[in-house]
A protein has these predicted regions:
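Eukaryote-specific, cytoplasm-facing alpha-helical/coiled-coil scaffolding segments in long proteins
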Residues: 148-149, 384, 433-442, 519-532
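Short glycine-rich, low-complexity segments
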Residues: 597-598, 611
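Blade-loop segments of beta-propeller domains
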Residues: 143-159
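Cysteine-centered motifs
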Residues: 579-581, 593, 605, 622
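Alpha-helical solenoid repeats of the armadillo/HEAT superfamily
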Residues: 110-123, 154-177, 190, 196-227, ...
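Alpha-helical repeat/alpha-solenoid scaffolds of the HEAT/ARM/MIF4G superfamily
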Residues: 46-47, 53-57, 63-107, 155-247, ...
């Protein structure tokens, strides 16, 4: 239907209605007129009525014709129609390419073919409604032709292709037909779609709205493919995407939706991917992340979208710090100083900075960061956060439990990694102001112990119901229950008990006596602490040894050493033999100092037994 024809239609309204005096005059003339003239008046009136009827019929015909055209447009999409559409697309693409080669300096010669090509690309969007037919795009080489058009000289054409690919790879559409989606994604990956998309990104001007939308849709394609096939993230990063994301993040441009999307895609690429983390470190990505986050050390994000970008950058930084080489880069880039400053400024970024410090210090790889943190007076920052959780945490989505979890984990890492004078400075903090920090530690201990007892009671009830129904509680179910216990507070409680064992073993009588006194006042037992540390030692590990997941890591040896303090001397021999059997002979080095055993076991023995075992040859164990 011609819409312009319908809009421009104006019915014949006839003559204007006469005024009252004109109407009287007209009636007098009709009375005075003869029969012939009266007949003429009737013929004129009939003519007007017939013209109105003709206009109505014409309008109805236009509407009927429009309905027929809509019925033709709503023909069902089938395999033959898709093949016909792909054939038309290939013809127009070839024709445009031929004319561009023939008349490179005369755009008028190929402009019409370019418009036709753009039209057929728009028509191909209908294929996204039928993912079962995606195999036709691959079999008829339409995917390769589309990828070739990503480098078209006219960015309008390349953007049209990006829009089409974004709709074809929509994650909801892909899940409608797993078979069709697999075929399409395989073809895109084989055609190095990410490399071609990055080349197209390099030439787009985001000051133009259409091209800015093209950038956004390009990132959407990557996100869709990464969600459907996570293993392609490594190839995507190596094909230039990671470098472009870092370049886009540090570009001096006002904050917009594309910068937010870049931070989100970056976090996706780094998730559970050590190769991408290493590549980011080699591209000086740690410095880029720190530079972008430094904006928020004294200023809060102005919008919710900007806050989301900040959280994405923090998540990316935490993910990178899982790699030991990136911790060195973080240390050299003065990341500790920036995080420490954020903790002092009390802005929204504080809770995320705490999480970054936790990732930077954990494990033996965090030793250098732990020592540097003490050197920059970080203890003055972390202990006020330990003594009292900050107010208004809920506004930034961080719970009190998450805050206490990160603080306790940082303190546990400091106690595990610090040596010499810096360790002494840390322990002295627990004796200040009449051991108030020990009191706070015991307060948290009983808080999470109560929470764990509630969770354990609920889990035991569920186990009882499962047994009654005849269900088998296998290892997978036990692991699920253990994860639930960790989430309920066991993870924090394990760190708290580890801190208790460390400070009680530090040969500081004031601390040992205070811990023992509070335990007696609350009617608690050291057996509970023993059980928690034992469970911690049995489950801890770095998870990087698929051949022997039960073997203890360097961190778990440290925990095992603490666990020995709680077992009693008569059981240390058996536990040591277990540790030595579980760990490579040339790496085992246990230093056991049961001096703290007097408080933890309840005995008053003052004798300090120091056992050092250096295993480089067959074991000789003498206690």
């Amino acid at each position: 239907m011609d819409v312009g024809e319908l809009l421009s239609y104006q019915p014949n309204r006839g003559t204007k209605r006469p005024r009252d005096d004109e109407e009287e005059e007209l009636k007098m003339r009709r009375r005075q007129a003869g029969p012939r003239e009266r007949g003429r008046y009737r013929e004129e009136e009939l003519t007007v009525v017939e013209e109105v009827d003709d206009d109505k019929k014409r309008l109805l015909q236009i509407i009927d014709r429009d309905g027929e055209e809509e019925e033709e447009e709503e023909e069902p999409l089938d395999e033959s129609s898709v093949k016909k559409m792909i054939l038309t697309f290939e013809k127009r693409s070839y024709k445009n390419q031929e004319l561009r080669i023939k008349f490179p300096d005369n755009p008028e010669k190929f402009m019409e073919s370019e418009l036709d090509l753009n039209d057929i690309i728009q028509e191909m969007h209908v294929v996204a409604t039928m993912p079962d037919l995606y195999h036709l795009l691959v079999e008829l080489n339409a995917v390769q032709s589309l990828l070739g058009l990503l480098g078209h000289d006219n960015t309008d054409v390349s953007i049209a292709v990006v829009d089409l690919l974004q709709e074809l790879t929509d994650i909801d559409t892909l899940h409608e037909s797993e078979e069709g989606a697999e075929v399409l994604i395989d073809a895109l990956v084989d055609g190095q779609v990410v490399a071609l998309l990055v080349q197209n990104l390099e030439r787009l001007d985001e000051s133009v709205k259409e091209e800015a939308d093209g950038v956004h849709n390009t990132l959407a394609i990557v996100e869709n493919m990464a969600e459907f096939r996570p293993e392609m993230c490594t190839e995507a990063a190596q094909q230039g995407l990671l470098q472009w994301l870092l370049k886009r993040l540090k570009a001096k441009m006002p904050f917009d939706a594309n910068k937010l999307y870049c931070s989100e895609v970056l976090a996706i690429l780094l998730q559970d991917n050590d190769e991408n983390r290493e590549l980011l470190g080699e591209l000086d990505g740690i410095d880029v992340l720190l530079q972008q986050l430094s904006v928020f050390k004294r200023h809060n994000p102005s919008t919710a979208e900007e806050q989301e970008m900040m959280e994405n950058l923090f998540d990316s930084l935490c993910s990178c710090l899982m790699l030991s080489s990136n911790r060195e880069r973080f240390l050299k880039g003065e990341g500790l100083q920036l995080m420490n400053l954020m903790l002092r400024e009390k802005k929204i970024s504080r809770s995320s900075a705490l999480k970054v410090l936790d990732h930077a210090m954990i494990g033996p790889e965090g030793t250098d960061n732990c020592h540097k943190f003490v050197d920059i007076l970080g203890l003055r920052t972390i202990f006020p956060l330990f003594m009292k959780s900050p107010r208004k945490i809920k506004k930034v989505g961080t719970t009190e439990k998450e805050h206490e979890e990160h603080v306790c984990s940082i303190l546990a890492s400091l106690l595990r990694n610090l040596r010499g004078q810096q360790r002494t400075r840390l322990l002295n903090k627990f004796t200040e102001n009449d051991s108030e920090k020990v009191d706070r530690l015991m307060e948290l201990h009983f808080k999470y112990l109560d929470a764990m007892q509630v969770a354990d009671k609920k889990i035991e009830g569920e186990k009882h119901d499962m047994v009654r129904r005849g269900e088998i509680i296998d290892n997978d179910i036990e692991d699920e229950f253990y994860l639930r216990r960790l989430d309920a507070g066991l993870f924090v409680l394990q760190h708290i008990c580890y801190i208790m064992a460390e400070i009680c073993n530090a040969n500081v009588p004031q601390i040992r006596q205070r811990v023992h006194q509070i335990l007696n006042m609350r009617g608690s037992s050291i057996k509970i602490v023993r059980h928690i540390i034992k469970e911690y030692a049995e489950n801890i590990g770095d998870g990087r040894s698929p051949e022997a997941p039960s073997k203890l890591s360097g961190t778990s040896l440290r925990v095992s050493w603490t666990f020995c303090l709680c077992l009693g001397l008569q059981r240390i021999r058996r536990w040591l033999l277990f540790c030595l059997c579980q760990y490579p002979w040339n790496l085992v080095r246990l230093i056991l100092c049961p001096a703290g055993l007097s408080v933890l076991s309840g005995s008053l023995c003052d004798q300090v037994i120091l056992v050092r075992i250096l295993v480089t040859s067959p074991v000789i164990l003498c206690l």
